[in-house]
Amino acid sequence: MASRQAYKRLSKEYKMMTENPPPYIVAAPKEDNILVWHYVITGPPETPYEDGQYHGTLVFPNDYPFNPPAIRMLTPNGRFRENTRLCLSMSDYHPDTWNPSWSVATILTGLLSFMTTDESSIGTMESTDSTKRKYAAKSKEHNATRSPIFCQIFPELAEQNRRDIEEAKKRKDETVVEDEHPFKQEQVVSLEEINDPEDRIRAQMLQQPAGNGTTSNSIGRSLLFVLFSLAALLVAVCYTRV
Protein backbone atom coordinates (compact mmCIF):
# COMPACT_ATOMS: atom_id res chain seq x y z
CA MET A 1 0.00 0.00 0.00
CA ALA A 2 1.25 3.46 -0.89
CA SER A 3 2.16 5.82 1.89
CA ARG A 4 0.25 9.05 2.07
CA GLN A 5 3.23 10.94 0.67
CA ALA A 6 3.71 8.45 -2.19
CA TYR A 7 0.02 8.61 -3.08
CA LYS A 8 0.05 12.40 -3.13
CA ARG A 9 3.23 12.59 -5.20
CA LEU A 10 2.15 9.98 -7.77
CA SER A 11 -1.30 11.55 -8.12
CA LYS A 12 0.37 14.86 -8.92
CA GLU A 13 2.69 13.21 -11.43
CA TYR A 14 -0.20 11.44 -13.13
CA LYS A 15 -1.89 14.78 -13.67
CA MET A 16 1.33 16.19 -15.11
CA MET A 17 1.78 13.19 -17.42
CA THR A 18 -1.78 13.57 -18.66
CA GLU A 19 -1.58 17.30 -19.28
CA ASN A 20 1.97 17.51 -20.59
CA PRO A 21 3.47 14.12 -21.49
CA PRO A 22 7.11 13.93 -22.64
CA PRO A 23 7.71 13.28 -26.36
CA TYR A 24 7.03 9.67 -27.44
CA ILE A 25 5.82 8.67 -23.96
CA VAL A 26 2.48 7.99 -22.26
CA ALA A 27 2.00 6.49 -18.80
CA ALA A 28 -0.76 5.76 -16.30
CA PRO A 29 -1.15 3.93 -12.97
CA LYS A 30 -3.44 0.97 -12.43
CA GLU A 31 -6.82 2.01 -11.10
CA ASP A 32 -6.53 -0.26 -8.08
CA ASN A 33 -2.85 0.36 -7.27
CA ILE A 34 -1.19 3.72 -7.80
CA LEU A 35 2.24 2.19 -7.13
CA VAL A 36 2.07 0.16 -10.36
CA TRP A 37 2.36 2.21 -13.54
CA HIS A 38 2.23 1.15 -17.16
CA TYR A 39 3.98 3.13 -19.86
CA VAL A 40 4.15 3.10 -23.66
CA ILE A 41 7.17 4.41 -25.52
CA THR A 42 6.82 5.11 -29.24
CA GLY A 43 10.07 4.53 -31.11
CA PRO A 44 11.47 7.87 -32.29
CA PRO A 45 12.30 8.57 -35.96
CA GLU A 46 15.72 7.72 -37.40
CA THR A 47 16.27 4.92 -34.89
CA PRO A 48 15.87 1.13 -35.25
CA TYR A 49 12.77 1.49 -33.06
CA GLU A 50 10.97 3.94 -35.35
CA ASP A 51 7.16 3.54 -35.15
CA GLY A 52 7.56 0.71 -32.65
CA GLN A 53 5.31 0.62 -29.58
CA TYR A 54 6.96 -0.52 -26.36
CA HIS A 55 4.89 -1.32 -23.29
CA GLY A 56 6.39 -1.72 -19.85
CA THR A 57 5.93 -1.16 -16.13
CA LEU A 58 7.22 0.98 -13.29
CA VAL A 59 6.66 -0.47 -9.82
CA PHE A 60 7.22 2.13 -7.11
CA PRO A 61 8.11 1.42 -3.47
CA ASN A 62 5.64 2.57 -0.85
CA ASP A 63 8.14 5.19 0.35
CA TYR A 64 8.44 6.88 -3.06
CA PRO A 65 9.85 9.44 -3.85
CA PHE A 66 12.67 8.53 -1.49
CA ASN A 67 13.50 5.35 -3.38
CA PRO A 68 13.37 4.47 -7.09
CA PRO A 69 11.01 2.11 -8.93
CA ALA A 70 11.66 -1.22 -10.61
CA ILE A 71 11.64 -0.82 -14.38
CA ARG A 72 10.63 -3.49 -16.89
CA MET A 73 9.77 -3.64 -20.59
CA LEU A 74 7.17 -6.19 -21.68
CA THR A 75 6.99 -5.78 -25.47
CA PRO A 76 9.68 -7.71 -27.42
CA ASN A 77 12.14 -5.09 -28.64
CA GLY A 78 15.65 -6.44 -29.23
CA ARG A 79 17.21 -4.09 -26.66
CA PHE A 80 15.87 -5.22 -23.27
CA ARG A 81 14.92 -8.67 -22.07
CA GLU A 82 11.18 -9.05 -21.70
CA ASN A 83 9.68 -8.60 -18.22
CA THR A 84 13.13 -8.32 -16.63
CA ARG A 85 14.22 -5.74 -14.07
CA LEU A 86 16.54 -3.25 -15.72
CA CYS A 87 19.69 -2.00 -14.05
CA LEU A 88 19.68 1.74 -14.66
CA SER A 89 20.83 4.72 -12.61
CA MET A 90 17.19 5.65 -11.91
CA SER A 91 15.97 2.11 -11.14
CA ASP A 92 15.79 0.15 -7.90
CA TYR A 93 19.18 -1.38 -8.72
CA HIS A 94 20.82 1.90 -7.72
CA PRO A 95 19.04 3.55 -4.78
CA ASP A 96 22.35 5.22 -3.95
CA THR A 97 22.22 7.30 -7.14
CA TRP A 98 18.51 8.07 -6.93
CA ASN A 99 17.35 11.68 -6.69
CA PRO A 100 13.93 12.25 -5.00
CA SER A 101 13.29 15.18 -7.31
CA TRP A 102 13.13 12.83 -10.29
CA SER A 103 9.66 12.01 -11.56
CA VAL A 104 7.85 9.53 -13.78
CA ALA A 105 8.58 11.78 -16.75
CA THR A 106 12.28 11.93 -15.80
CA ILE A 107 12.49 8.15 -15.42
CA LEU A 108 10.84 7.33 -18.73
CA THR A 109 12.76 9.99 -20.65
CA GLY A 110 15.97 8.50 -19.25
CA LEU A 111 14.80 5.00 -20.22
CA LEU A 112 14.12 6.11 -23.79
CA SER A 113 17.51 7.81 -23.98
CA PHE A 114 19.28 4.68 -22.71
CA MET A 115 17.27 2.50 -25.11
CA THR A 116 18.65 4.31 -28.15
CA THR A 117 22.28 3.73 -27.10
CA ASP A 118 24.38 0.57 -27.27
CA GLU A 119 25.34 0.59 -23.59
CA SER A 120 24.96 -2.76 -21.86
CA SER A 121 23.68 -3.48 -18.37
CA ILE A 122 21.70 -6.08 -16.46
CA GLY A 123 18.53 -6.73 -18.43
CA THR A 124 19.87 -5.58 -21.80
CA MET A 125 20.52 -7.81 -24.82
CA GLU A 126 22.39 -7.57 -28.10
CA SER A 127 20.72 -7.69 -31.50
CA THR A 128 21.18 -6.17 -34.94
CA ASP A 129 19.38 -3.05 -36.08
CA SER A 130 17.54 -5.24 -38.58
CA THR A 131 16.22 -7.40 -35.74
CA LYS A 132 15.12 -4.33 -33.78
CA ARG A 133 13.22 -3.05 -36.83
CA LYS A 134 11.45 -6.39 -37.19
CA TYR A 135 10.38 -6.21 -33.55
CA ALA A 136 9.22 -2.63 -34.10
CA ALA A 137 7.08 -3.68 -37.07
CA LYS A 138 5.38 -6.40 -35.00
CA SER A 139 5.06 -4.48 -31.72
CA LYS A 140 1.58 -3.01 -32.23
CA GLU A 141 0.11 -6.35 -33.20
CA HIS A 142 1.77 -7.95 -30.18
CA ASN A 143 0.35 -5.37 -27.79
CA ALA A 144 -3.16 -5.48 -29.26
CA THR A 145 -3.48 -9.26 -29.56
CA ARG A 146 -1.18 -10.79 -26.94
CA SER A 147 -1.26 -8.35 -24.03
CA PRO A 148 -4.60 -8.16 -22.17
CA ILE A 149 -3.15 -5.76 -19.62
CA PHE A 150 -2.08 -3.38 -22.40
CA CYS A 151 -5.63 -3.40 -23.77
CA GLN A 152 -7.00 -2.80 -20.28
CA ILE A 153 -4.72 0.12 -19.40
CA PHE A 154 -4.58 1.69 -22.87
CA PRO A 155 -7.90 0.81 -24.59
CA GLU A 156 -7.69 3.66 -27.10
CA LEU A 157 -4.21 2.66 -28.22
CA ALA A 158 -5.31 -0.97 -28.47
CA GLU A 159 -8.27 -0.03 -30.66
CA GLN A 160 -6.07 2.13 -32.89
CA ASN A 161 -3.63 -0.77 -33.20
CA ARG A 162 -6.43 -3.07 -34.36
CA ARG A 163 -7.51 -0.55 -36.99
CA ASP A 164 -3.94 -0.17 -38.21
CA ILE A 165 -3.55 -3.95 -38.43
CA GLU A 166 -6.79 -4.27 -40.41
CA GLU A 167 -5.77 -1.50 -42.81
CA ALA A 168 -2.38 -3.12 -43.34
CA LYS A 169 -4.07 -6.45 -44.06
CA LYS A 170 -6.38 -4.83 -46.63
CA ARG A 171 -3.45 -3.18 -48.38
CA LYS A 172 -1.62 -6.50 -48.48
CA ASP A 173 -4.66 -8.29 -49.94
CA GLU A 174 -5.05 -5.60 -52.60
CA THR A 175 -1.40 -5.98 -53.55
CA VAL A 176 -1.84 -9.76 -53.90
CA VAL A 177 -4.86 -9.28 -56.19
CA GLU A 178 -2.90 -6.85 -58.37
CA ASP A 179 -0.01 -9.30 -58.59
CA GLU A 180 -2.38 -12.06 -59.72
CA HIS A 181 -3.63 -9.84 -62.57
CA PRO A 182 -0.47 -8.15 -63.85
CA PHE A 183 -1.79 -7.42 -67.34
CA LYS A 184 -4.26 -4.71 -68.18
CA GLN A 185 -7.40 -5.64 -70.06
CA GLU A 186 -6.78 -5.58 -73.82
CA GLN A 187 -8.31 -2.67 -75.64
CA VAL A 188 -11.24 -3.60 -77.88
CA VAL A 189 -10.57 -2.86 -81.57
CA SER A 190 -13.43 -2.46 -84.06
CA LEU A 191 -13.48 -4.38 -87.34
CA GLU A 192 -13.18 -1.11 -89.27
CA GLU A 193 -9.78 -0.52 -87.66
CA ILE A 194 -8.38 -3.83 -88.95
CA ASN A 195 -6.70 -3.37 -92.34
CA ASP A 196 -5.42 -6.89 -92.98
CA PRO A 197 -8.20 -9.01 -94.60
CA GLU A 198 -7.05 -12.20 -92.89
CA ASP A 199 -6.99 -10.56 -89.46
CA ARG A 200 -10.43 -9.08 -90.07
CA ILE A 201 -11.89 -12.51 -90.88
CA ARG A 202 -10.38 -13.97 -87.71
CA ALA A 203 -11.88 -11.14 -85.68
CA GLN A 204 -15.29 -11.78 -87.23
CA MET A 205 -15.04 -15.45 -86.31
CA LEU A 206 -14.24 -14.60 -82.67
CA GLN A 207 -17.26 -12.28 -82.46
CA GLN A 208 -19.73 -14.89 -83.74
CA PRO A 209 -21.78 -16.92 -81.22
CA ALA A 210 -20.56 -20.47 -80.70
CA GLY A 211 -23.83 -22.02 -81.96
CA ASN A 212 -23.96 -20.14 -85.29
CA GLY A 213 -22.61 -22.95 -87.47
CA THR A 214 -23.76 -21.54 -90.84
CA THR A 215 -21.99 -18.23 -90.38
CA SER A 216 -18.87 -19.96 -89.09
CA ASN A 217 -18.75 -22.22 -92.15
CA SER A 218 -19.17 -19.22 -94.46
CA ILE A 219 -16.36 -17.38 -92.75
CA GLY A 220 -14.25 -20.51 -92.88
CA ARG A 221 -14.69 -20.75 -96.64
CA SER A 222 -13.82 -17.06 -96.95
CA LEU A 223 -10.66 -17.65 -94.95
CA LEU A 224 -9.66 -20.56 -97.17
CA PHE A 225 -10.26 -18.41 -100.26
CA VAL A 226 -7.97 -15.71 -98.87
CA LEU A 227 -5.28 -18.26 -98.06
CA PHE A 228 -5.44 -19.82 -101.54
CA SER A 229 -5.30 -16.34 -103.07
CA LEU A 230 -2.22 -15.48 -101.07
CA ALA A 231 -0.57 -18.76 -102.05
CA ALA A 232 -1.32 -18.14 -105.73
CA LEU A 233 0.11 -14.66 -105.46
CA LEU A 234 3.33 -15.98 -103.93
CA VAL A 235 3.67 -18.60 -106.70
CA ALA A 236 3.15 -15.92 -109.34
CA VAL A 237 5.81 -13.70 -107.80
CA CYS A 238 8.28 -16.57 -107.67
CA TYR A 239 7.52 -17.53 -111.30
CA THR A 240 8.04 -13.91 -112.44
CA ARG A 241 11.45 -13.76 -110.73
CA VAL A 242 12.49 -17.00 -112.40
Swiss-Prot record:
Cytoplasmic side: 1-217
Transmembrane domains' residue ranges: 218-240
A Pfam cross-reference name: UQ_con
Domain UBC core: 5-163
Active site (UniProt): C87 (glycyl thioester intermediate)
EC number of the protein: 2.3.2.23
Protein name: Ubiquitin-conjugating enzyme E2 6
Species whose genome carries this gene: Eremothecium gossypii (strain ATCC 10895 / CBS 109.51 / FGSC 9923 / NRRL Y-1056) (Yeast)
Taxonomic path: Eukaryota, Fungi, Dikarya, Ascomycota, Saccharomycotina
Name of the gene this protein is made from: UBC6
